Amino acid sequence: FPKDTKALKYLANQHGYQLKTVEAAVDVNSTQKTRLYEKACQRMITFQGLKAAVLGLAFKPGTDDLREAPSLDNVKLLLEGGAQVMAYDPVAVTNFEKHYPEGANEKGSIFYVDTVEEALSGANICFIFTEWQEIKNVTPAAFKKLMKNPLVYDGRNVFDVQAMKEAGIE
């Protein structure tokens, strides 16, 4: 867990120790946060004007905790790229909105929706950052039906890759 490794690194430094393995883990955790966005950049020419569904804002299901949540860094990059972000999370929206108020942000915009289906409706691309049950309940066929372009980056391995491909989702 990123919070634990950062705390361990801090404590070691306070006592004059350098834990290289822990420091490496902290570095890897940091770069992993935007891995999905980086993968999407290899595929997309631009995010300007694209509708991006973001499913899950919290660090993990069952909490509204945003500390170390990959959604924070990725939404920032999407907004800077000019995307219209449709964000869904059953409990973390209030906390997330403190970082990104609804409406115009950076070069893009963000809107908070009440259902996964609302987020997916007409989306060009989808990012999954938290494995909420509400997200798991959506079928691959629903992604295909609702999205304008069914391109999904599943950061929590919620869905079976083969089942998604068979449904026509990239």
Per-region residue spans from a language model:
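Structural/interface elements that position substrates and couple domains in central-metabolism enzymes
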Residues: 1-170
